[in-house]
Amino acid sequence: MDFLLKQVFVGLPKTVGNKEAVNPMEREWTSAIFKEPAEGPVWVGRTGLAGDGQGDLKHHGGPEKAVFAYSFENYRYWQSELGISEITSGGMGENLVMANVNEESIAIGDTFQIGEAVIQVSQPRQPCWKPARRFKVKNLALLLQKTGLTGWYFRVLKEGYVGIGANINFSGPALSPVDHPKMQSNYSC
């Protein structure tokens, strides 16, 4: 089965919510989880995509978390499980939406060429509270972790442009593969 780059998302931090809100889910907060579809090819550099940013540099971004990817197929699960149709591609704050690949089919160290860029799986995403706030599902971070549908991070081995519809060429498995469930146990919250 061929892997496919379905969508590319970028976004800068923004503040949403209400300073005066009593309900914690409605209070003001800042995040870059609200990403927008990229128009045309996007430059992937060593620390991320052009036009993208993070609201919390302590926990997000940097060379080992340069690109966040999420499986297109995971969204159908979340829509069904949570009954929230608004949970769609880009909703988890990812940069790349990849089809025909998921947390069970990749391992730390797997290397892919997408367009001009060469990227390597560096670690699973550690679910934080921001998707829960975005979709107002208090235990979403825990659900993401329990299901293993967390997404994963890439480090960038070769910078270059990526664009929607690009084939994703699997250019090398990890020398000592660590599958995603094992990755999760090493990076849990």
Task: Label every PLM stretch briefly.
Residues 1-114, 118-130, 176-189:
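Electropositive, beta-rich accessory/interaction domains or terminal extensions
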Residues 36, 157-160, 172-175:
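Short, contiguous, pocket-lining structural segments
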Residues 143-146, 150-157, 168-171:
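Active-site scaffold segments
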